[in-house]
Amino acid sequence: MLLGALGGCAPRQVVPRPVSGGLNQTFVLRVGQTATIRDRPLEITFKDVFSDSRCPTGAMCIVAGEVVMLLLAQVANNIKDITFHVRPGGDAHEFAGYTIRVTQIDPPKGPPETMIAENQYVAYIQVRAGKATSPIPISPTTPMISPSY
């Protein structure tokens, strides 16, 4: 009888509520949260944060670093895991006729001795119909072309 009473005291896992976003509008997702795009068959879920190499507060860094995160995108039976490398300026990928852009990740990286819990991460996302029209962020493997004088 005591075991049955204790079973009711187990902590419950909190599942974030789904959100609704619109095309060409910024919406916010937490890890585990799903957004449906109004009047479209597209759903986006913020699945995971793999790494966070952003420059810590108060540090002098040569590069800004990035957050590597996973979104799951779905239109009907077309489902795809998409890995984003979010640097200053964001990262964008095309899926099923849409451009999905992660523009920012919060919270900012704190001092080196502090850790950000996975449930604290927030992604700012924009969805557009069609292909990306703005420049794609430069990846570390993309050669940079210097102007010649």
Regions found by a protein language model. Give the residues of each.
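Solvent-exposed coil/turn segments that connect beta secondary-structure elements
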Residues: 40-42, 47-51, 66, 74-78, ...
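Mature extracytoplasmic domains of secretory-pathway proteins
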Residues: 50-87, 91
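C-terminal motif of bacterial Sec signal peptides marking the signal peptidase cleavage site
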Residues: 5-8
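Bacterial signal peptide processing site
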Residues: 10-12
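Short Fe-S-cluster ligation motifs
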Residues: 85-104
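N-terminal secretory signal peptides
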Residues: 15-63
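C-terminal partner/receptor-binding element of secreted or periplasmic proteins
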Residues: 105-149
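Extracytoplasmic
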Residues: 30-32, 39-41, 64-68, 79, ...
